[in-house]
Structures are given as structure tokens and as C-alpha cells.
Amino acid sequence: MEINLKDIDLFIEENKENILRDIGRLVAVPSIEGEPEENAPFGAEPKKALELGLKIAEEMGLSTRNCENYIGYAELPGEDKEKYIATVTHLDVVPVGEG
């Protein structure tokens, strides 16, 4: 499958409101690393951000996996199970402060 940049631009334009809504949902979580808790190795807020990120992915139709609240991932199976595209991201943030 060939990826056409015009298709990507069209997808973004057609889904702009949902994209902005989901970014807003994610940045509303103050996901600063806290004290480890049971089932929350980086604290309660990073766990909330991880759960929300996976929920958003599920809302988009992707299958997700939470790996003991350390990391999670979402995937959309393609035709060729041997090939896939991956991206690395994080949902935790640093404390609020000046620049």
C-alpha cells in the first residue's frame, strides 16, 4: 500500500475537531510522575493518562494493550502481519513552571 500525503492531509482536515478534542482530553490530565502506588508504578496521574490514551485509541477502533501500567500500545492490524508502522510517544509531563 502506498501512502499518499494528500490522503493524510484529507484525514486530518476531516477529523480536525476530534483530534483537537482528544488532545484537550489528554492535556487535561496532570500526568506528572508521582509516588508509586499499587498498579500505578509512576503514580496515579500517569496511570490516568495511560488509561485515557488507550481509551481514545479504542474509540478509534484500535485494539489496545496495557502492560502493567508501565506502557501501553494500540494497533490496527494490516494485510501483512509481518510489516507494520510504529510510533513512540509519551503522555507524562514535567511539572508546571517557567520555560
Where does each model-flagged region fall?
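Acidic/His- and Gly-rich active-site-bordering loop/insert found
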Residues: 2-99
